[in-house]
């Protein structure tokens, strides 16, 4: 069974750069405290690392 990540948006992207806004949107997050579950792949890890100051990540 592959690992999954539960990603939660904790801070707003208002005031962030365009790249940060698009990265959060690409993860499937729109609202604060919204959570999504994604496969633990290098691409997802890279997106999470880019906006880690806005997110909380847990392994599921």
Swiss-Prot record:
Q: In which organism is this protein found? A: Oceanobacillus iheyensis (strain DSM 14371 / CIP 107618 / JCM 11309 / KCTC 3954 / HTE831)
Per its record, what are the GO molecular function terms?
structural constituent of ribosome
Q: What is this protein called?
A: Large ribosomal subunit protein uL30
* NCBIfam families, per database record: rpmD_bact (TIGR01308)
Keyword Ribonucleoprotein part of the UniProt annotation: yes
Under the subunit heading, UniProt states:
Part of the 50S ribosomal subunit.
Question: Do you know which InterPro entries this protein is assigned to?
Answer: Ribo_uL30_ferredoxin-like_sf (IPR036919), Ribosomal_uL30_bac-type (IPR005996), Ribosomal_uL30_ferredoxin-like (IPR016082)
Transmembrane segments annotated in the record for this chain: none
